Amino acid sequence: MKILAVGAHPDDIEIFMYGLLRILKTRGDNIFLAIATDGCQGGDLPKKELVKIRKKETISGLSELAKPYFLNLPDGQLGDNLNHKLKIRNLINKINPDMIITHDKKDYHSDHRILSNFVSEIAGHYIPVIYSETMMGINFTPNYYIDITDVFDIKKKAVMCHLSQKPDRFVNL
């Protein structure tokens, strides 16, 4: 199967989706990864410098899964924007996945919610969309859990690549 994971920010795939993706890769699925925004709002450094740092952290964190696509949409500014939707649609059409994993529509973060709605609107009628758990389960009602115990240490290593984000706070999610 071709699996596409779409995270709103650099580090989202590692925090919310990595365990499942690692299991899917181990069973032989083809993994494709996309980061929607540039991550420029995720710290106190100058925005251009932070974008470069977060991109390097993401490439490192995801290196055992796949090379990510960076859509470079503006962090904190996803909205009902045709250009944003077109970038996501073009990526989905290019990859033509059998399944998409993204954020839940009720996630705590507006970029996560908007991205989830984009993905569902663009592909939800013909591609199964799986929604990841939200931060500490807030507003999330799961209908299935995946045990990631066997890959947890690898997930932790991936999350810890994001030093600019003080990753210790995300390791056990």
Task: Label each PLM-derived region with a short phrase.
Residues 1-4, 23, 45, 79-173:
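Metal-dependent de-N-acetylase/amidase catalytic core
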